Amino acid sequence: MRQIAEMRKEVSQHGFDVRMMEVPGMKVAIAGDGEVNYLFMLLPFRDKFKLKKRDVWLFKKLSYKFKARPFLVTFDKMLSFYPLHALEEGGEHFELDIRNSRGLMFSFDTIVSEQLQQRLVV
């Protein structure tokens, strides 16, 4: 619950509305500001995750339908956002190794900053 509250607080500071979605077996949130949407899969903090392929494909399908950028979100001392390409193939599942994926981690400030830069260029 703390993770959800922290995520809502951080995302709301940037003018985004956040809503939780009911997706079986996953905690998923959608955030939008009228121009861009983000879809977040909330994960408890661990060093390694094994995610079922069907859950990841469902998450990816939802992001496509909502025209949202998908991110995996973990919370330790701060929120960490990972793109889906941080996942590694692991047979019947996908794996997210936090230590190996640190270079792919973003803060929400960085994600919003990149989006604003793209809007200015267009």
Swiss-Prot record:
- Keywords for this protein: Plasmid
Q: What is this protein called?
A: Uncharacterized protein ORF6
Q: Which organism is it from?
A: Methanothermobacter thermautotrophicus
